[in-house]
Structures are given as structure tokens and as C-alpha cells.
Amino acid sequence: VEHAFLSNGSDVNNFLKTESGLKKLGVADATGIARYLGLQKMGVRVNVPEGTYTLDSVLASGKGIKISNDLFTSGAGTVLSTKKENISSQRFEIVSIGNGYYNIIAEHSGKALQAVGDGKAGYAYIEQRERNSALEAQKWCFIDAGNGTYYIMSALNTCIDIHSGVTSDGNTVWTYTCNQSN
């Protein structure tokens, strides 16, 4: 038991024998914490080939991420959009920055996708910003979701997600607590 004084060994042993006693002491292991919070293990983090891609939605067939209104400016957000040929605001360059992380660069603007905020709220909006590979908010990794699809997770531990699961064009694409949903 970490941070406990053993001035009365019998009390400590009584607490350690029952789950309710452990809860009173605040003792838990990672498995117990995950079970209590209802967390599940996600797929394996994988390396992906660098290149230019569209970031397609599994939830909404024929749709993917694009920069809102095809803007070039820093601060422009990401939205869901019907995929169209030759729309550079729907294409993103995936660039390895080491340690399994990548920058995701909007082809039309050359700016990096960045989760806005510290991620502590469980969600963050995504904007394009000047590229700075040192920023945690611009670091992304890919988690195998099976069937050739991936969850894209920020270094802030939130995953790219369609806001409220609404699949209409123009709906916000943001990061949200990784929940293994489409």
C-alpha cells in the first residue's frame, strides 16, 4: 500500500482483504480503474505510409473531412463533406514526425491540423494552423480499427470524430474522447 503507515498492521490487513476496504483506502490497479470507468482497450497503434490521402468517414459513406469553405487561413475548422474529385481542401498529406506520430497537412493550404485546447475537456475542435511539429496538439497517431480503417488519435488522447454523429455536409469534425465508435 503506497503512502500508508503501518502503525496498526491488523487494520491494514482488514482493509486489504475486501474490495470495499480497498476502495476506502483508494487502492486500485489499472485494470480495476479501467473496469470501473467502463474503458476498453483500443486497437494497436500502427505506422502508415507517408503520402497524400483523403480522410474518409466510416459513418457516412462517400464523405470525408475537409477544411471549411476551402479556406486558406489559420483557424479554419474541419467539417464533413461529400467527396468530390480534385478538391485539394479534402486531401491531406501524412508526414511522419517520429515516435509513431504524424502531422496531417491540408494539401491546399500547407497548414497542419491542430486540436484546439488541452484535451482535458474530452473534446477539442480541429483547426488548420501553421505547422509546428513540436506542438502536442499537431501530433496524430493511427490506431488499427480493423477492416483497413483507423482511428486517428491526437497526442492529447482524443480521436477524430463527427460531432454528435450527424452526417450532413458542413457538420463539425472535432476530436472527442476515444470511444471506438464510427
Question: Which stretches of residues belong to each language-model region?
Answer:
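Active-site-adjacent mobile loop/cap segments within catalytic or ligand-binding domains
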Residues: 1-44
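Lectin-like carbohydrate-binding module/patch detector with strong preference for beta-trefoil
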Residues: 45-182
